[in-house]
UniProtKB/Swiss-Prot annotation:
Annotated source species: Schizosaccharomyces pombe (strain 972 / ATCC 24843)
UniProt record similarity statement: Belongs to the SYG1 (TC 2.A.94) family.
Keyword Transmembrane helix: yes
Protein's name in the database: Protein SYG1 homolog
GO MF entries: inositol hexakisphosphate binding; phosphate transmembrane transporter activity
Domain (EXS) ranges: 459-654
Keywords, alphabetical: Cell membrane, Membrane, Transmembrane, Transmembrane helix
Length: 682
């Protein structure tokens, strides 16, 4: 493989502009070989030599061609400057980690001594709850943040939490050490690739121009610090020592296994095969079940409920497709979503879980529509939901507990929008729910049907149930809360309040659609058409200019942004056109007004198109974040020192021990085994 491809494949995409420009170096060498006299400033004429002889002579006196020398200086200075920034950032991280290690060791020593002396309870039992609350407030006032690293302005960080338990502090410190070790490996890889690029380009220069300057290159590069690997090596050794001392009982070998275990080295062919088997077995069942549909009232409502389940599964499949596209285009979605790259599932593993759920769905759907058990048909959707719910919350008996736990926590965070700081994955997940209005409306339909024991099911549909209309607006309401919270944290009316206005139009459109279904007439039809049209135009403009940032205004003209993941422009143009078409799908409700009362078929296909549009939207939305990271040379997760605390006095230690008095030091030695056990199911 050519070295240009090697450096392109092994480099950190977010640091691409800071690497040695190997392709440009090759072009300069080719230009010198084609026109050797260029840039020699008349040297050949003064010495009475041909240009070729002048180059050879310069090689003999250990000098590069002036154009090539200028290029090397420019590239070396660029790499050196960026490496110094990396070292400075690493030093700040190391100082912060050292402070937290000191806190942790003091806390552990104090806890161990307290447990041995038997004086665990530091707050006397006779103190009232009010006194304990006052003590906690006093402790809060004595705590200060250990360090401050400014975060991205549009994504404010959480306020620090001073009451961090010993167990939580240990977990955070372990994760921080692992992240920092990975960061040092990226820095070391940056050094290695650039040093190798310099060596390769000089070798090519010697080969093309028949010189021998490898020795001079060694002396030339020795003055740059990025050629000195001792800096990163010493830090890596220091992290290894800290990790071994704190978490593996001085077992250096085990510490190295933990630090150097990368999930990316695993193979996922078995996961892909299992997904193929599950999907291949489920798809024929689902198709045959749909063929058994008969136009009875009960079957129509059953099909509507199963349709909602299918759309949710389909949305997860398309998200995995997004992950595949990001992986192929080298978009670091793990960093953007702030996933733990060591513990998070690969998208193929996630797809295997979705395949299992799809197979269960297809099996129950087939049994329901085929009417295998007369009298039990209406209970198959509830049974499916119970099986999947058990599958979701079972921590041990079902594999991949970490992913399922993350999904549960993310759902809770979305439904509690506004109560905590909103991160990228929070509003991204809520945006997926905005595209699932059909499934959200089915929540009301599902519980209404079973509450009424499937008697008079027409009273539960969209023409009779205001609650169904409310559930279709719920995702938009949650997004509005998130926008208000982001405004509260940043105090920036733009873009957060304007974004909230966009979702308010979405809520109003869904509300008037529900009112039109309940009260057929011209008034609500006109109101729905107006607000749905405004929402579509507003959302489409926001997609292009803000979420995707495809069009930028430069020199008084609108043009496509300069930096794009894909070199061709036509995929972005097609995405803009398709996005507009699907955004205008509200028009179908106006075209078929006679079916508006119970238009489950129209709603299903409109939502299906919206989910596919969301899949496309996801790709370009995350690409926008990736471009931001590349422009700002951000390739690693930021340390969040505000999650840690810095004690002002021993009161801090006392409070931590009192909150963790049931956590004995013997459990320290069990943590690594616990990590191994969890890894088997993650």
């Amino acid at each position: 493989m050519k070295f240009g491809k090697v450096i392109e494949g092994q480099s950190v995409a977010e640091w691409a502009s800071a690497y040695f420009d190997y392709k440009k170096g090759k072009k300069i060498i080719a230009g010198i070989a084609k026109n050797p006299s260029e840039g020699l400033y008349g040297t050949s004429g003064i010495l009475g030599e041909t240009p070729e002889e002048a180059i050879v002579k310069r090689g003999q006196i250990h000098r590069f061609h002036p154009l090539f020398q200028e290029f090397l200086d420019q590239q070396a200075n660029k790499v050196e400057e960026f490496f110094e920034n990396l070292v400075s950032d690493a030093r700040e991280r190391m100082d912060l980690i050292s402070d937290q290690v000191d806190i942790y060791e003091k806390l552990r020593a104090f806890k161990k001594g307290t447990l041995e002396s038997g004086s665990v309870v530091l707050i006397q039992k006779q103190h009232s709850k009010l006194r304990q609350r006052l003590d906690s407030i006093l402790n809060f006032s004595r705590l200060q943040p250990a360090y401050h690293i400014p975060a991205r302005k549009s994504v404010p960080t959480d306020a620090y939490t001073p009451m961090v338990s010993y167990r939580k502090l240990k977990s955070k410190l372990k994760t921080t050490l692992l992240d920092f070790y990975d960061y040092l490996k990226l820095v070391s890889q940056y050094q290695h690739l650039n040093q190798q690029a310099f060596r390769k380009i000089v070798k090519k220069y010697d080969k093309t121009l028949h010189t021998d300057l490898q020795g001079f290159w060694v002396d030339y590069m020795s003055r740059y610090t990025f050629t000195d690997f001792s800096i990163t090596t010493n830090w890596q050794l220091h992290v290894e020592d800290i990790y071994a001392r704190l978490f593996t009982n001085h077992n250096k070998k085990l510490a190295l296994e933990h630090l150097k275990s990368f999930r990316q080295k695993e193979h996922f062919s078995a996961n892909s095969m299992r997904f193929g088997l599950l999907f291949g077995a489920g798809l024929p069942l689902a198709i045959e079940a749909a063929c058994y549909y008969n136009a009875t009232e009960q079957s129509s409502y059953l099909l509507q409920i199963w349709g909602g389940f299918f759309l949710v599964i389909f949305a997860f499949v398309l998200f995995d497709l997004d992950c595949y596209v990001w992986e192929k285009t080298r978009v670091n979605y793990m960093l953007i979503f702030e996933f733990n790259q060591r513990k998070s599932l690969n998208w193929r593993q996630h797809l295997e879980i979705v395949g299992a759920v799809f197979f269960i769905f297809s099996l129950f759907f087939f049994l329901c529509m085929r009417n295998f058990f007369p009298g039990f048909t209406i209970y198959f959707p509830a049974l499916f939901l119970g099986v999947v719910g058990t599958f979701l919350i079972a921590p041990v008996i079902v594999p991949y507990w970490r992913m399922r736990r993350y999904l549960i926590i993310q759902l809770i965070r979305v439904f509690l929008s506004g109560l905590s700081t909103v991160h990228f994955q929070d509003f991204f997940f809520a945006d997926q729910m905005v595209s699932l209005t059909y499934a959200c409306g089915n929540i009301s339909l599902f519980f209404c049907l079973y509450k009424r024991l499937w008697r008079q099911p027409q009273l539960c549909n969209s023409s009779h149930s205001p609650l169904l209309g409310f559930f279709t607006t719920l995702p938009g309401i949650l997004r509005v809360f998130q926008c208000f919270r982001r405004y509260s944290d940043s105090l920036k009316s733009f873009p957060h309040l304007v974004n909230a206005l966009k979702y308010i139009f979405n809520i109003l459109a869904q509300m008037f659609l529900s009112l039109w279904r309940i009260h057929p007439g011209l008034k609500y039809r006109v109101l729905y058409t107006i607000f749905a049209g405004v929402n579509s135009l507003f959302s489409y403009t926001w997609d292009i200019l803000m979420d995707w940032n495809l069009l930028v205004r430069k020199d008084g003209r609108w043009q496509f942004r300069e930096h794009r993941i894909l070199k061709q422009l036509w995929p972005y143009i097609i995405a803009m056109i398709l996005n507009f078409i699907v955004r205008s799908s509200f028009i179908f409700y106006c075209i078929f007004p006679n079916h508006i009362q119970h238009s489950s078929g129209i709603s299903f296909f409109v939502t299906l198109a919206e989910i596919m549009r969301r899949c496309m939207w996801n790709i370009l939305r995350v690409e926008h974040e990736e471009i931001y990271n590349r422009e700002n040379l951000r390739a690693a997760r930021e340390l969040k020192p505000l999650d840690f605390v810095k004690p002002h006095s021993d009161v801090f230690v006392s409070h931590q021990i009192s909150s963790d008095k049931n956590y004995t030091d013997d459990e320290d030695s069990m943590d690594d085994q616990t990590d191994v056990d969890e890894a088997q199911f993650s």
